[in-house]
Amino acid sequence: MLKRFNQYDNFIFDFDGTLADTACEVLSCIERAFNKCNVAFDKERLNPSVMGPSLAEIAVIVKPDLTDEQIVNNIVAEYRKIYDYDENDITKLYDGIRDWLLYLKQNNKKIFVATNKPKIPTLRLVKSLNIDFFDDVYMVDKYDDKKLTKQQMIEEIVSKYNLLKEKTIMVGDCLSDIEAAKKAGVLSLVALWGYGADKKALKDKSDFYLEKITND
């Protein structure tokens, strides 16, 4: 299972677009939040290409003339109510992900999550998707008194677990994941099955890239 990476000891994974395909669930909850707030929008603008930015930014992408900050905040709040505890979540792991994670664990590799996703839905999904065996899970709101950037998450994981940077890979699907890895001094592996749109740039800027999970 991706044996060519056996020389590396530590793997830090992004969540949305890397481990799991969350787009359908997220977009459905955004639509429900807009409807709950009685805000009309062009449904054609609500597609997987909007994935990545914060919810507030997505709301404005979906409805460019939405300039009232309070309405944006209301949409975000409604989304959180719907998404955080959705018992009918349709999120699914990408093909081969669980097997890869198990392979890494069985070969004494350390595995982590570093995601801009909030704590409640992240921990809910890690459990419901049956991948709750990470060495640690870092989320944007892991701490109550501060928000973490992706770079800070990586740096703290490296420091807390005494990881060698040259033996550590950040696995993500967006340019921001690659940039965070470089700033934190670790290697980057881009998952081309994710939401990052510019595949050429992702290939050019990352240390490694994967189009699919294989047994080599």
Where are these regions (language model features)?
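Substrate-recognition/cap helix-loop segment adjacent to the acidic, metal-dependent catalytic center
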Residues: 35-37, 57-66, 90, 98, ...
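Structural recognition of alpha->loop->beta junctions
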Residues: 129-139, 200-216
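N-terminal helical cap/lid subdomain that shapes the substrate entry/recognition surface
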Residues: 5-15, 19-98, 103, 107, ...
